[in-house]
Amino acid sequence: KYHEFLARYPDLETLAEAPTDEVKATWKPLGYNIRPVRLQMIAREVQQEYGGTIPETPADLQKLKGIGKYTAAAVSCFGYNKPVPLVDTNVDRVLQRGFYGKNSSETAKDENTVWELAETLVPQDNPYDYNQALMDFGATVCTARKPLCLFCPMQTFCLAYPVST
């Protein structure tokens, strides 16, 4: 159904100009029905404020209503290959364990501290691949429950190794 949505609205201009009820009806099978309204609102804002070109930097993207820090970073990195960090739940866990030693609430660093650390780690070359790999690593190896510490390539420097669960 997502591909049908993209086929019907292949660009920002088409989405921005479509009747909202039509956009909502096309999206309905995908669930989370506030999303098409927000997407259309952003498409209209990009058309009006940026001449139809999606901004490249997280700072400019966050000026769009409804775009937060993570989404702005994701668009900047995955859409424009900009070397910006992405910190989702999985990445947060990897960085908390690897660089701060734990993932408990007593020792967990605040969100800004983790984002600042993540920013120092993103390579200038291939930030897309790096961010994807780090998210995948947190989802498959450094998992919330039963992390695979024995197979972890970060063992030699991970401050939480081995994680006891």
Task: Identify the function of each model-found stretch.
Residues 1-164:
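Catalytic cores of DNA base-excision repair glycosylases
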